[in-house]
Design a protein with these regions (language model features):
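Gly/Ser-rich helix-loop-strand patches that form or flank binding pockets
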Residues: 1-27, 120-166
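Alpha-helical elements of Rossmann-like donor-binding domains used by nucleotide-donor carbohydrate transfer enzymes
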Residues: 54, 90-93, 117
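Short, well-ordered secondary-structure micro-motifs
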Residues: 1, 30-31, 51-52, 78-82, ...
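Short, hinge-like loop/turn segments at secondary-structure boundaries
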Residues: 37, 83-87, 125, 148-150
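Hydrophobic alpha-helical membrane-association signature
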Residues: 6, 51, 87-91, 149
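Charged docking surfaces used in two-component/phosphorelay signaling
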Residues: 109-117
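Small/aliphatic-rich secondary-structure junction motif
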Residues: 33-85, 95-99, 104-108, 156, ...
């Protein structure tokens, strides 16, 4: 994706969810595309949580596994255990109790730069879809910075990315 591309303009400004298939997504082997493993990435902001109903709905519709992911900044190793436990509980609390009836849910906390953490998990788990919120109040300049999380994820993801403007 090039700076200021049409796809980026759309996912940043659209009032509906946008499914972006970036340059690193392989050609599907069949005409039917199934989302069997979905990653929902959140920073717990209101904007990112607006994408959660879409992740849950797609997981239910596709009988998919759903991984809830929160990426924390790098911290000393001693703090990781303390921080990850509470964060995992916050992630698990996002899922309705009946979700276990129709999908397999897991929570993952990682300590990396956000875009790298999302992409790393997508590669490790061979994700079929990443679902994430996009902050609607990002300035035009901030939206185009190469380290903007949604921009980096869409540009480098090994699978389609569903963005929901917050």
């Amino acid at each position: 994706m090039v700076l200021g591309s049409g796809a980026e303009q759309i996912f940043r400004n659209a009032r509906c969810p946008v499914l972006t298939v970036g340059p690193n997504v392989p050609q599907p082997s069949s005409e039917v595309i199934e989302f069997k493993h979905i990653i929902f990435a959140t920073d717990f902001s209101d904007g990112s949580l607006k994408a959660l109903p879409y992740a849950l709905s797609l997981a239910e519709e596709n009988q998919a596994s759903l991984t809830l992911l929160h990426v924390l900044p790098l911290v000393p190793m001693q703090q990781e255990i303390y921080l990850s436990g509470g964060t995992e509980k916050r992630l698990e609390a996002l899922v309705p109790p009946d979700a276990k009836d129709w999908c397999q849910v897991s929570a993952v906390v990682s300590f990396e730069f956000p875009a790298e953490g999302i992409l790393h998990l997508a590669n490790i788990q061979s994700a079929d879809l990443i679902v994430m919120g996009v902050h609607k109040h990002a300035s035009r300049v901030a939206a185009h910075l190469p380290w903007a999380i949604a921009y980096e994820v869409v540009c480098h993801a090994p699978c389609p990315v569903l963005t929901v403007r917050g």
